[in-house]
């Protein structure tokens, strides 16, 4: 659906209650891309198609917990988005992203993903409060002149 993004309302685990993209831990023996596809299958009962990596984000929490997040996009999917015990599927108009119901960092980098920009980011959190961030955004590609 053009201009629409398939996200989830997370029902359990870290970030429960928030709107986010499907995702989770990479299992032993998986690549991050394989893990992203498996998580979409588990959380939404869909298989992403045309998957590409958009970014790698690093999160540090003041309690010492840290994680590395590989962000992927897909051009399509197979299956029907279905509610599971982990997530409720939500179609969101990309011009009306519900940032107030998402992690605080999302408003900084989701627009870059939607624009197809390449970037990396580092974020510092104290529980759900973002204390700091650093984004490195690659320059936009020049359009060829004819």
Residue ranges of each PLM-predicted region?
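A short, polar/proline- and glycine-enriched secondary-structure boundary/capping micro-motif
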Residues: 16-20, 94-95, 132-133, 143-145
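N-terminal strand-loop-strand
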Residues: 1-20, 48, 52
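The catalytic Nudix box helix
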Residues: 21-54, 72
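Short loop segments at secondary-structure junctions
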Residues: 2-4, 11, 75-80, 94-96, ...
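Intrinsically disordered, low-complexity, charged terminal extensions of DNA damage-control enzymes
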Residues: 47, 57-58, 65, 112, ...
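Active-site-adjacent beta-strand/loop module that shapes the phosphate/pyrophosphate-binding cleft
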Residues: 59-85, 90, 106-118
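Charged phosphate-binding loop/patch that engages nucleotide di/tri-phosphates or the phosphate backbone
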Residues: 115-146
């Amino acid at each position: 659906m053009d201009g629409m993004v398939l996200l989830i309302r997370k029902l359990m685990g870290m970030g429960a209650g928030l709107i986010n993209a499907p995702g989770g831990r990479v299992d032993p023996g998986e690549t991050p891309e394989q893990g992203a596809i498996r998580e979409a299958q588990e959380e939404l009962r869909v298989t992403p198609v045309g998957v590409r990596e958009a970014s790698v984000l690093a999160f540090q929490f003041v309690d010492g917990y840290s994680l590395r997040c590989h962000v992927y996009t897909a051009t399509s999917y197979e299956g029907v988005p279905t509610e599971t015990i982990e997530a409720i599927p939500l179609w969101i108009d990309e011009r009306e992203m519900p940032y107030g119901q998402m992690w605080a960092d999302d408003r900084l980098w989701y627009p870059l993903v939607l624009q197809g920009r390449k970037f990396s980011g580092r974020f510092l959190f104290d529980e759900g409060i973002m204390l700091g961030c650093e984004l490195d955004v690659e320059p936009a590609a020049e359009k060829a002149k004819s």
